[in-house]
Amino acid sequence: MRSTLPPPPLRVLIAEAHPIVVLGLADLLKTLGYMLVGSVASGPEAILAAGEHQPDLMLVDVDLKGEMDGITAAIEIHTRLGIRSVVLAEHCDRTVQTRAAEAALFAVLDKTSPVSAIADVLRAAPLRLIH
């Protein structure tokens, strides 16, 4: 008899400089049945944590602490480890969208988007990461 166990939960790492935003994202991930494997506040920390935790997906703010921005960190993580990112931007202007598109990141979301829009992107992640 074949086992019909559900697939393991999507493992997500958050790179975000604001703790209150991390809490909100963590709550959303829990609601969706995903597993938060860690959170960091800077680009270099994100690169190290991605190597350590090997998440399925990253949630990365454009404006991280320090000199490295989130898109640069996400590009480095994807190049080194093949891990894709959802980039969150307070102001999702054309420059952010263009840089993210050129880097083949998973998605770019404006932080002012409704929670339901962020949830929709995260719900689609397991299917899009496989293909």
Predicted features, each with a name:
Residues I71-I83:
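Short amphipathic alpha-helix used as the core "switch/output" element in two-component signaling
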Residues D61-D63:
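Active-site residues of response regulator receiver
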Residues M1-R11, S116-H131:
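Non-catalytic signal-transmission and effector/linker regions of two-component phosphorelay proteins
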Residues P19-G38:
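Two-component/phosphorelay signaling modules centered on CheY-like receiver
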Residues G82-R94:
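A short, hydrophobic beta-strand element within the central beta-sheet of small alpha/beta folds
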